[in-house]
Amino acid sequence: MVLAIMANAVCICMAQDNIVRMLPENGATEVNIDTHLTLIMSDDVTIGQKGFVSVYDKQTGKLVDRLDMSIPAGPTESQPKNPAAQYTPVPYIYKSQPITNRNTKAGTPSGVNAWDTRRYQLDIIGGFSDGFHFYPMITKGKQVTIYLHHNMLEYGHEYYVTIDKGVISGFNGIKSKKGWSFRTKEKAPDKSQRLLTVSVDGKGDFSTVQGAMDFIPDSINSAQEGYKVLVKNGDYEELVYFRNKRFVTIEGESREGVVIHYRNNEVFNPHPAEIKTNEVRGTFPSRRAAFAADNCSDLTFRNLTIRTDYKGQAEGLLVNGERNFFENIHIIGDGDALQANGSCYWQNCRIDGGGDTILGRGPSFFNHCTITSYGAFMWIRNTAENHGNIFVDCHFKGRSDSAELGRLPNNNGKNYPHAECVLLNCTLENIPAFGWGEIDDSAKTATILEFNSHDTDGQSIDTSKRNPLMRQLDPIRDAELIGRYSDSHWVLGW
């Protein structure tokens, strides 16, 4: 017996000889159920392409979750364009039921789309059964973070983790039940607790933004029943997607201190090959944003940085819904950095993108915001049902000589004749003299208005070379119209 114990101890020691620290610590208690697993090693980490990371219930021995490292994270090349792709013939149904990895197979079609049979990592996030491709392990020098499938851990359970040899290059793995174990908190926060804290160090109610949003009930009826999620300063590398939420405030401790980001784009998480997404109300949801609030209304976001870490069609933030308010938010993306479908108010926000930086159906009211872009600042797609993008006292910074304010080119035979963009008292920096780029004949009925644009010294911009479809407003003749567009209630309807 003594020899067996000694042999087991030697095995554990050999398996862990290059681990400096585990998070959660081995034997930790009061661990959040949305925790990531982190190893800090003695040398820089290289991820292997074989083996399993497994989590077991320590009491029952039941396998709770498993990551197969032989499966690629997701696509690395764009899927072929399908000219036969259509918008869903019936509106997409946002079911309000607990769909998680524990009760549903990731990849289960949630709409009229077909099963995707390609072999990639899949994780149900925020009730989206089709799942998201994800990185099961992410390295930063000597640190490796393991991302379990969402919603697999439960309150009041003790778990142990095993890691096969080969999962991490040069690491013998963890084989013993005693090698890495932890116990989760005994119970969830009380449902009557309307203030939830997220802290990346595990000292809050949740360790991730996604964990907090998963906890909050769908479709809350009033502000009195609403929740506030306070996010402590930290680096939150997570793909965030939630749906059907109302009357929730997500507030960071500070804008620069709270960074929520992930490597996501249209290549990594594409729309179904046979289904078009985004543009038409009620169509199949997009999965390419780093952070998406889908079919959500009456939300408030404050003091956060939201960023995608990939190039391409890659939103930092995608929001679908009505009456959503954003204050002091920094959004960083590439093409389509911000996609906003539904009425949104943006106060003192910063938006940085690569081109078509602001996309969507609107309406959006931007007040004292700063927008930077390498290509066109916006591609507005509102219909006659609502206003488009209205900017009041905003600052546009061009990052290249081709950073025109917007464009309305022919879009595969379709255009946006009711598109609307209004600039009032805005600062323009390094913007081409013609202002707007291409406007196809099919969009010449668009409303593009400008009033009192000036440079960084406050001097009036020379608008004599503007695109002729970009109308300059007169302070006397158009005073009433300027007043209307300056009123967010008139623009947004609330």
Label the predicted regions:
Residues 5, 50, 240-241:
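Short glycine-/acidic-enriched loop or helix-start segments at secondary-structure transitions
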Residues 187-494:
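Sequence-level preference for short, compositionally simple segments enriched
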Residues 6, 28, 150, 155, ...:
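Short N-terminal micro-motifs specific to bacterial/archaeal maturation
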Residues 16-189:
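Acidic, low-complexity Ser/Thr/Gly/Pro-rich repeat segments typical of extracellular/periplasmic
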Residues 1-16:
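Bacterial Sec-dependent N-terminal signal peptides
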